[in-house]
Every structure is written in C-alpha cells, then in structure tokens.
Amino acid sequence: TEGPDFYIPMVNTSGLVRSPYEYPQYYLVNPAAFAFLGAYMFFLIIIGFPVNFLTLYVTLEHKKLRTPLNYILLNLAVSDLFMVIGGFTTTMYSSMHGYFVLGRLGCNIEGFFATLGGMISLWSLAVLAIERWVVVCKPISNFRFGENHAIMGVSMTWLLALSCTVPPLVGWSRYIPEGMQCACGIDYYTRAEGYNNESFVIYMFTCHFSVPLFIIFFCYGRLLCAVKEAAAAQQESETTQRAEREVTRMVVIMVIGFLVCWLPYASVAWFIFTHQGSEFGPLFMAIPSFFAKSSSIYNPVIYICMNKQFRQCMITTLFCGKNPFEGEEEGSSTKTEASSASSVSPA
C-alpha cells in the first residue's frame, strides 16, 4: 500500500492506510517482533559503540598506531559510530512504540545518517583493499604510500558517501520507512512521481555497490596472487608459508564479511525495485537490514581487533598500561617482517 510519503509492504484489502508516522504498525507483524527489533538494536548499541569508540581512543593514546595505513581503519570506526548513534538509537526508540514516531523530518535525518555510515563503511573497505594492493603488489614503481595518500583515501570515502546520501534529501529519490516501518532507507519500493527513483536506484547500485564490490575482488585477488608468488619463491621458509596462510585466511574473511554485510540487503532491495507490485512482507526487507546493521560489530572485529598491533594496544589500554597476555602474543605471533606478504596481514 503506497501513501504520499511511505510504503506499507502488504496488500491492503480494507482500503485503510495507516501512516507509519502516526499509528502503530502491529497489524504488519506480531508485536513481539517489534520488541525483538528493539532488543537487537540495544544489543548493537551496547557492543558497537564501546568497541568503535575504544578504537578511536586507543589510537589517540598510542602514537605508533597513528600511521597512514591505519587512517582508513579509523574512518571505518567513525562510520560505524555514525550508524550506531544516528541510526540504531532512533530505530530502537521507534520499535518501542511500534511505528516511526519521529515524523517525516526524523525519517530524513535517520535515513541520512544511517545510510551515510553504511556508505562510508562500504567505501572504506574498498579503499582499504586498494591501499593494501598498492603497498604489497606495487603496481606503481617507486611509489611510497604516505599521509597525503591516506587523507585522500579517507576524503574520497566521505565524498562518495555524500554523493549517495544527499540526493534523497534534495529530491532525487527520498527516504521512507522500510521493513517494519521503524527505520528509514532509500525508496526502492515506489516510482513516486517527481522523485526519479528509478534513475537513482540504478545509479546507486552501479556506482555504490557494483564498483566497490569489483574493487574489493580485484585488489584482494591480485594481492593473493602476489602472496602466493612470494611463498613459492621461498618454499623452504616456514615463516613465509605461515604468512601466506594468514594472509589468505584474512582475505577470505574480509570478502565474506563484505558479502554477508551487503549482499542480502542489496539483493532484496534490487528484487523489490525490479518487481514493484509484487507481494512481500515487512520481514522480507527487515531481516537483510539486520545483516547490514551488524557490520558495526563485525567490522571492528575483522579489521581492527584481529590486527595484532591494534589488539595489543587495546589490551594495554584496558589493563591500565599492562598487557597480561604479552607472553602469549609474542609466542603466537609470526615474524613475517622478512616477507613482503606480511605487510598486508591485518592479523
């Protein structure tokens, strides 16, 4: 059922349209589902905020972490905080009431910040892949990655993210409640007159999903080839072989993490866009959005907590300057400095 500034994902046989800005949406799903959504958002907040905030704090406290290659990881933490503060809090609050209580303006604000955080995160992963490919594979001879390049990479993620999130605020597409009507996102659902949703969705999927997906697969594919070549040239070196296995494992985890985060949401959104008028329930879009929102937790785990240097500094900060696991860390760490492959491993 389509309203002037919303879309209810169900067939309305009664002819009554209940605005998600004014009325509880308990007729869509069992009220227990709204309670679960609120509890899930609360879980993401109490885990996602401390982990990402701690990442920023630890970096400010430890000078050795403030290196150009780590700038993009900090940007990733900032983007996750945008999602937590700008998106999860409002979704939790709305789910407690059963509808989007913040009104049309609140929907624009929540949709903008939640989408901005997601886009910055997505492009940060693409820039991270480019940086590692450039540093390890050296496609440009005599190129030395420095602070200016890192700042440029971070700036690009913000510019690209804004190029996706600002247009719906100024009339090219729009933000509307989606799923269980407690969170707002891009309008994939309608072809509302005057918003040019079709062209925007095609632009978004082409430039802001397909392009970063290609970048990640290309860069990490080339990186794996470089690591395997380095390992093949030093077959007698157990250290190099171990480094290859570590890098391969991390690349696989990174790609899987990206796909788990974005592929379900993007696939369902594209299906809804290309099958407008088809019947689907509110959970059809709500469940994939859970995967995308969960990135605020597993992004820090994959890209930061599994980074030896970040992990050791984080433990030192938490234990007031001491690392009780220092012996274990040193014993389990591999001396991969001798291999060029080691510079890519975030672990």
From Swiss-Prot:
SUPFAM superfamilies: Family A G protein-coupled receptor-like (SSF81321)
A GO MF term: 11-cis retinal binding
Modified-residue entries (N6-(retinylidene)lysine), positions: 293
Main localization category: membrane
Record region (Disordered): 326-347
InterPro entries according to UniProt: GPCR_opsins, GPCR_Rhodpsn, GPCR_Rhodpsn_7TM, Opsin, Retinal_BS, Rhodopsin, Rhodopsin_N
Its job: Photoreceptor required for image-forming vision at low light intensity. While most salt water fish species use retinal as chromophore, most freshwater fish use 3-dehydroretinal, or a mixture of retinal and 3-dehydroretinal. Light-induced isomerization of 11-cis to all-trans retinal triggers a conformational change that activates signaling via G-proteins. Subsequent receptor phosphorylation mediates displacement of the bound G-protein alpha subunit by arrestin and terminates signaling.
The protein's name in its UniProt record: Rhodopsin
